[in-house]
Amino acid sequence: MTEKHTLRLADPSAIDSIISVDEFLQIKEQYDAEQPLITLQTKFNLAWALVRSDSTQHVQQGLSLFCSIYKDSPERRLECLYYIALSHYKLKQYEESRRYLNMLLSKDPNSPEALKLKNRLYDAVTKEGYIGMVVVAGAVVSVAALVGWASKRLFSKRRP
């Protein structure tokens, strides 16, 4: 019997679009209005809004909120695993993203959103690997050219 997927998660591509200032302010106002007894959903909404920001600091704050929700609310743990993985992905912390994503997939292997994120993660790691190889190759060529140039100058000065 195939396990049916039940979690409702944002598509991983949602991380690519930046939250509007108006939407962020609306969520932040709701969060502030509920002080000191903030509902779990409002805290979650703020975390998601922060992660969709273009500010690394905001993304880190959102990640921290998701981790707090994960710790304090067992009923939202699977959902939080996904958003923690997505947050790490946005921060380009791919190993951490993979770790949380694997935790989620071990509990919910049929999650379409998690499987999409897994593919995006693979593509990002592959792309970074290629970029890394190009950078290293460029550095090797530069060093070789510099050594060649220095050797030529050194040996050309030695001749009588």
Swiss-Prot record:
TPR repeats lie at residues 78-111. It comes from the Eukaryota. One of its GO terms (cellular component) is peroxisomal membrane. Its main location: mitochondrion. Keywords: Membrane, Mitochondrion, Mitochondrion outer membrane, Repeat, TPR repeat, Transmembrane, Transmembrane helix. It is found in: Mitochondrion outer membrane. InterPro entries: Fis1, Fis1_cytosol, Fis1_TPR_C, Fis1_TPR_N, TPR-like_helical_dom_sf. Coiled coil: none annotated. Residues 151-160 are mitochondrial intermembrane. One of its GO terms (molecular function) is lipid binding. It is a single-pass membrane protein. GO terms for biological process: mitochondrial fission; mitochondrial membrane fission; peroxisome fission. Residues 1-129 are cytoplasmic. The chain crosses the membrane at residues 130-150. The C-terminus is required for mitochondrial localization, while the N-terminus is necessary for mitochondrial fission. Belongs to the FIS1 family. Has a role in mitochondrial fission. Has a role in outer membrane fission but not matrix separation. This is Mitochondrial fission 1 protein. It comes from Schizosaccharomyces pombe (strain 972 / ATCC 24843) (Fission yeast).
